[in-house]
Structure formats: structure tokens, C-alpha cells
């Protein structure tokens, strides 16, 4: 059916793009390790938290990318976002519990700010948002993000020629 074909084309496109675009050797090593760990069933929110605590940010990004199927560029973007909304959606799509999400959010905020404290109101706000997000809706949003801009354009070009 069309959805299966779209999914297969998307996976092939993303694999090819990922191999050509990630040139940073540290990130390549992190992606390789994340794939191996995923294959062994060792990636989870606790592991992500430990990556951040140990300041292994590239491994965190690679592992989260592997867990949710999003490109590392989208993960990096979600980490740079001050409000944390994208990160909340990604974590909710993985059904990460509230306390673990709050911890991950704070660790990311600290890594961005050099360890400075985060405003309590922002933390309360993002945790409240996290509570309001339904797992099903988060999965739909992540699925939409997985179909990145270049893939959507390629599919549009293919449909225009048929």
C-alpha cells in the first residue's frame, strides 16, 4: 500500500542523507554506538539521563535520534530551543515519565547555560505542558517531523512527474 511504500522510501532516503551529511567524527562514533546499543535493547530514558550527567551530549543526541527516529539536526534544534516544547513532544512520544523528563530538561538547560540555575517558572511551565501532551498526539507530531522537508519535497517531485 502507499503508506508502506512511502515509509520504505523515506527510510532509504534518510539513511542515505544521514550517511552523507554527518561528517563530524565524534557524532559518527556516537551514532554507531547508539545503533549498537539500540540493537542490544540498551537505550532508554535512564541512559539518556546518564549521558547528560556525564556531559556526553553527542551520545545523548545520537541515542535520542535512534530512539525516536528523528535526524540528529532536529534533536540538536530541540535542545537549543529555550522553551523546551519540541523536546517535551519528543520525550512524550517515547512515553518518558514526568520526573525523568524534568530532569532531562534541567540537564540540557544547564549544559546550554554553563551550569547556571534555571528559572523555576520556566521549569513549572514546561512540566505543565508535558503533562498536557498526550502520548498519541506526540507520536503523530514526531511522525510528521520524521518526514523531513527534503523527503517531502522529493515525494512531491515524484508525484508531480506521475
Predicted feature residues:
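Alpha-helical scaffold segments
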Residues: 1-162
Amino acid at each position: 500500500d502507499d503508506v508502506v511504500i512511502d515509509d520504505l522510501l523515506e527510510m532509504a532516503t534518510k539513511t542515505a542523507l544521514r550517511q552523507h551529511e554527518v561528517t563530524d567524527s565524534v557524532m559518527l562514533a556516537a551514532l554507531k554506538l547508539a545503533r549498537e546499543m539500540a540493537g542490544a535493547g540498551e537505550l532508554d530514558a535512564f541512559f539518556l539521563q546518564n549521558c547528560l550527567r556525564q556531559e556526553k551530549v553527542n551520545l545523548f543526541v545520537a541515542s535520542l535520534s535512534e530512539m525516536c527516529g528523528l535526524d540528529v539536526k532536529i534533536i540538536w534544534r530541540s535542545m537549543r530551543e529555550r522553551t523546551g516544547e519540541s523536546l517535551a513532544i519528543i520525550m512524550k512520544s517515547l512515553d518518558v515519565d514526568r520526573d525523568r523528563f524534568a530532569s532531562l530538561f534541567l540537564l540540557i538547560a544547564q549544559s546550554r547555560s554553563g551550569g547556571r540555575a534555571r528559572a523555576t517558572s520556566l521549569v513549572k511551565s514546561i512540566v505543565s505542558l508535558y503533562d498536557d501532551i498526550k502520548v498519541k498526539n506526540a507520536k503523530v507530531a514526531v511522525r510528521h517531523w520524521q518526514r523531513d522537508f527534503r523527503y517531502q519535497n522529493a515525494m512531491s517531485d515524484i508525484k508531480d512527474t506521475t
